């Protein structure tokens, strides 16, 4: 039996970048990582062997420490708490997610923001935290109906998806 591996299989460019940069950082020093850096147990195990300490909340990091922001990004509050605790965030968020975050911040005051993705996924949660209350995450068809009510209540004339 012949097994063919597609050219596009494997990690996306954002995850490749995050893992590569985290490895470089860990060669020099041990740092925290907020949540699993990527959804790959082998990669997480390898990085822990290099000294990465996974924490679940920015509040778990010591003052004046360094914390990697994983490929999926983080919620807005994380950046605020880090500043208060003098924590240096080593932001390895995927470039595409960073670009979406910038666009959300640009449009949040004059548009209803719709994020399409899993409601429980760190990427969706993080992006929504940068939007105003006039936003929602659509995961399935039911959510489309619910979002229509939210859009109508918002009194906004623009929708940004």
Where are these regions (language model features)?
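The feature marks the mature, well-folded catalytic cores of soluble enzymes
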Residues: 1-160
């Amino acid at each position: 039996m012949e097994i063919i591996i597609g050219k596009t299989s494997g990690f996306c460019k954002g995850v490749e970048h995050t893992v590569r940069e985290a490895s470089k950082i860990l060669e020099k020093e041990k740092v925290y990582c907020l949540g699993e850096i990527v959804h790959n147990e082998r990669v997480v195990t390898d990085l822990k062997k290099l000294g990465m300490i996974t924490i679940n909340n920015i509040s778990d990091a010591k003052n004046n420490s360094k914390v990697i922001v994983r490929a999926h990004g983080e919620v807005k509050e994380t950046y605020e708490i880090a500043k208060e605790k003098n924590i240096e965030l080593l932001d390895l968020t995927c470039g595409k997610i960073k670009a979406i975050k910038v666009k959300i911040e640009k449009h949040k005051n004059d548009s209803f923001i719709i994020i399409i993705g899993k409601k429980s996924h760190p990427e969706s949660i993080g992006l929504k935290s940068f939007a105003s209350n006039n936003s929602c995450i659509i995961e399935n068809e039911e959510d489309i109906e619910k979002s229509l009510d939210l859009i109508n209540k918002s009194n906004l004339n623009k929708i940004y998806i």
